[in-house]
Amino acid sequence: MKRLLTIQDISCVGQCSTTVALPLISACGVECAVLPPALLSNHTAPGFTGWSFCDLTAELGKVEAKWVEQGIAFDAFYTGYVCESHIDPILSIFKTCAKPGAIRIVDPAMADNGVLYRGFAADFPSKMARLCRDADYLLPNLTEAALLTGLEPKLSGYSKGEVEDLIGKLHGLGVRNVVLTGVSFDDSLLGTAVSDGRTVAYDFNPREPRSSHGTGDVFASVFAGAILRGKSAAEAAALAADVVCAAI
């Protein structure tokens, strides 16, 4: 059984981040280890009026040291919601706790609907870009893709050419495979654009009439599990989208 380490916060309430990743990746038949760099009382999405935040940055190096001491290593890493102070420790863990050929899956969970999540400074996308560089799989939504590439996000109306231009810019960060979510050229359909740097494959599902927080984490978790079970990026993205639709 392959072993994956997911590095993202624990939100005690809100059906997101680590509390979503652990059961879904485990259900895929992959051992899921966790490293939460922060503990939040709840999700920061609209609908919650505030939250507590316990920063665990100081613990990350201690955990890493014990893993190195014991020879604990991982076949893959999957990062989600993290803060600026977490990025350097995560990059270090990528180097010291990786098995040969370890896969890096990065979900740059920081923005949606044209704006950064509450709590992130305006310059955070440039910090997140450091974590995204050289990722094997990058899973941004359209807003995150725009911010990572220094563009002004649009709320809607992306053309196929604009989508593929965004993808090209993301590959420019050294990303091997881009899985762009929230793609739509028809108001009734919503889907993904998956690129290996040579071709772009699109997959769409009927658009749900309501928005649900945590769906991006469900998508990324199932995607990560499917990749570790040998699925291609396009196959993993299609499966993850189907699971999200079924869950909603």
Residue ranges: model-predicted function:
Residues 7-10, 37, 80-82, 107-109, ...:
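Fold-independent oxyanion-binding glycine-rich loops
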Residues 164, 169-248:
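Conserved phosphate-binding/catalytic region of the ribokinase-like
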